């Protein structure tokens, strides 16, 4: 008796543990039957007020590059959309555990029937029977491949037949069954493959997210430098307008004194009008750049920040390190850090798991089967005896009920034991063979993809490094051109004052100076863009900017 009870505990222990793991929270059923939440609450832009400062002309947003990128990471809509891809991949892991979810079921029916008697052995002229079966079962697939079930069934039967010893008759049965694969689907290594695949795909998604965010951060930083360039270009054009106004005023005084021909006044007037147009165009470009910057950091979503001026603290500094880049070192760093290359390599891990899954599908299906049932019988017992005259006599009634049936069932005195082996062997499993072939082809294809990405990484870094070197030289030459433009203007002004030159050449020198200053701004920003692009191509942009993806 004790050994049978111990056997019962061993058999039922997995089901009890499974139930505990399935319902870890008291709110389980509340979550199941709760109304689904379909309304989405979008958060308002955050932390914008942290960078508000009071200036002479009112409040403004003062942003360094770091503070601006912090706002971009907090409020950029495209980055928020990209992050959701990770949630989908995490949900796929949860879904991969679903084959191991236990399943509980219950069934109760009540059937009453009246049938005419066809023989005296039925014990009544009209047989009236009430049958009430109830069944409760619990089943689960374990990571080892074992599929087990535990079920309890009880049936209460009442009848008006005079030949029944039990009325009502209560029959109970406790059944344990299992199926253990021996070849196909055997062991945790095979049955947990979908979970491993989902986790590996999550890592692929995380690498792709990092690559996507890196591109979005690059776009956002380019918007920052667009605004810096527009701001400094406006300053250059305003300075050019001041020079044009000074030249026009001087020409007007000379015209009044008769030192200039009336026909020569049109050139400085035309020059001043051109400078005004350039200033208007620069202001328009500045407004456009500010609007683009607001979109990147989510300020356009908050009415309180849509029209607040933006003050950027970064400038167009001259590069100090003019030493050439070690291109091969940059390539090695890119091969180490590029997230798209990491994602491509991670896909190979997914392919290996897919091949293992396909190999398992092609194996023969050999399973060990087991079945054990313990039965019990109870109810009011009517002993029937036949006297010498052949009449059936009912003896004293022995009361009974469900307890008798359950005690007899747990006594394990009336068992049914069954063991067996089942083999399912497809003669030609073409679908599984095709799946295995496809998985092998996918592994080869993705291996070639890794090689292609490596080639692309190298080319990207070489191109980006060349752009950095070219930008350095362009900034250096722009400084030289600005120095010559300043000297040229000074020389033309002195010659004009001495009467050896005309106003046309002075105006031409002024325009050359404006063009040189504008070229210096453009080349300085182009250098910053090229450095930014190199960081993007080596995969170090987020680390360099101190950005951590949560």
Regions found by a protein language model. Name each.
Residues 20-131, 178-193, 197-199, 224, ...:
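Bacterial Sec-pathway N-terminal export signals of envelope proteins
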Residues 96, 206-330, 467, 491-494, ...:
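Periplasmic alpha-helical coiled-coil/stalk elements that build and connect Gram-negative outer-membrane
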Residues 80-84, 97, 143-171, 184-207, ...:
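Sec/SRP-type N-terminal targeting helices
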Residues 183, 260, 264-266, 301-382, ...:
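Amphipathic alpha-helical coiled-coil scaffold segments and their short linker/junction regions
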Residues 7, 18-33, 291-308, 314-321, ...:
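Acidic, low-complexity, intrinsically disordered peripheral segments
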Residues 2-8:
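Sec-dependent signal peptide recognition
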Residues 54-60, 108-176, 313-323, 356, ...:
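Small/polar, glycine/serine/threonine/aspartate-rich low-complexity segments that form flexible
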Residues 13-15:
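N-terminal signal peptide c-region/cleavage motif recognized by signal peptidases
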């Amino acid at each position: 008796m004790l050994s049978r009870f111990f056997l019962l505990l061993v058999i039922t222990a997995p089901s009890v543990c499974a139930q505990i793991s399935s319902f870890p929270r008291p709110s389980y059923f509340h979550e199941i039957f709760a109304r689904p939440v379909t309304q989405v609450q979008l958060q308002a832009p955050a932390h914008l007020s942290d960078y508000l400062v009071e200036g002479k002309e009112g409040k403004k947003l003062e942003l360094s590059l770091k503070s601006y990128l912090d706002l971009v990471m907090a409020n950029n809509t495209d980055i928020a959309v990209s992050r959701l891809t990770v949630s989908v991949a995490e949900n796929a892991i949860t879904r991969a555990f679903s084959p191991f979810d236990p399943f509980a079921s219950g069934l109760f029916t009540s059937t009453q029937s009246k049938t005419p008697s066809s023989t005296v052995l039925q014990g009544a002229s009209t047989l009236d029977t009430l049958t009430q079966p109830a069944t409760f079962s619990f089943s689960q697939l374990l990571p080892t491949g074992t599929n087990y079930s535990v079920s309890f069934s009880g049936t209460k039967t009442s009848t008006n037949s005079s030949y029944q010893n039990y009325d009502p008759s209560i029959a109970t049965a406790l059944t344990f069954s299992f199926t253990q694969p021996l070849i196909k689907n055997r062991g945790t290594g095979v049955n947990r493959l979908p979970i491993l695949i989902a986790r590996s795909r999550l890592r692929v998604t995380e690498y792709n997210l990092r690559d996507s965010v890196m591109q979005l951060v690059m776009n956002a930083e380019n918007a920052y430098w667009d605004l810096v360039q527009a701001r400094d270009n406006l300053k250059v054009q305003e300075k050019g307008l001041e020079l044009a106004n000074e030249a026009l005023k001087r020409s007007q005084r000379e015209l009044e004194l008769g030192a200039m021909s009336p026909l020569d006044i049109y050139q400085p007037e035309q020059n001043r009008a051109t400078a005004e147009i350039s200033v208007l165009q620069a202001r328009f470009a500045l407004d456009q750049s500010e609007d683009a910057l607001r979109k990147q950091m989510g300020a356009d979503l908050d009415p309180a920040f849509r029209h607040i001026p933006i003050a950027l603290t970064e400038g167009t500094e001259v590069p100090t390190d003019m030493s050439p880049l070690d291109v091969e070192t940059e390539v090695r760093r890119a091969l180490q850090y590029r997230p798209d290359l990491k994602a491509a390599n991670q896909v190979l891990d997914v392919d290996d798991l897919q091949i293992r899954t396909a190999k398992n599908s092609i194996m023969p299906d050999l399973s060990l089967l087991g079945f054990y049932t313990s039965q019990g019988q109870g109810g009011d017992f009517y002993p029937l005896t036949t006297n010498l005259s052949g009449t059936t006599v009912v003896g004293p009634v022995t009361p009974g009920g469900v307890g008798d049936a359950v005690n007899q069932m747990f006594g394990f005195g009336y068992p049914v034991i069954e063991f067996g082996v089942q083999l399912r062997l497809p003669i030609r499993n073409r679908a599984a063979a095709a799946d295995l072939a496809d998985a092998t082809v996918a592994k080869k294809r993705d291996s070639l993809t890794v090689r292609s990405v490596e080639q692309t990484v190298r080319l990207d870094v070489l191109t980006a490094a060349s752009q950095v070197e070219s930008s350095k030289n362009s900034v250096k030459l722009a400084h030289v051109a600005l120095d010559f433009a300043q000297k040229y203007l000074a020389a033309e002004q002195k010659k004009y004052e001495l009467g050896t030159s005309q106003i046309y050449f002075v105006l031409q020198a002024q325009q050359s100076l404006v063009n040189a200053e504008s070229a210096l701004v453009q080349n300085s920003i182009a250098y910053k863009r090229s450095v930014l692009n190199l960081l993007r191509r080596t995969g170090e942009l987020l680390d360099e900017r101190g950005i951590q993806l949560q």
